[in-house]
């Protein structure tokens, strides 16, 4: 599970087996998880996060979209 970055208690990562899916990022905090597609940035699924947190997380994903895509390509294209 490569971690792309952390912001506070949130960990942004992807799974090694995610190669066959479109570019996306998982976010976790404690037992809460979410998955965002990146092109365009949109929520795919969520478990445990409140709506306000999801909105904040989506903004963080948008703000770091380029970094996430670069990390994805570097990991899966090597």
Language-model features, listed with the residues they occupy:
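C-terminal structural segments of small proteins and small subunits
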Residues: 51-78
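Feature detects long, helix-prone N-terminal segments enriched in hydrophobes
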Residues: 11-13
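A short, structured beta-strand/loop element
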Residues: 15-49
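Negatively charged, low-complexity tracts enriched in Asp/Glu with abundant Ser/Thr
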Residues: 1-9
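Alpha-helical interaction segments
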Residues: 4, 26, 62-66
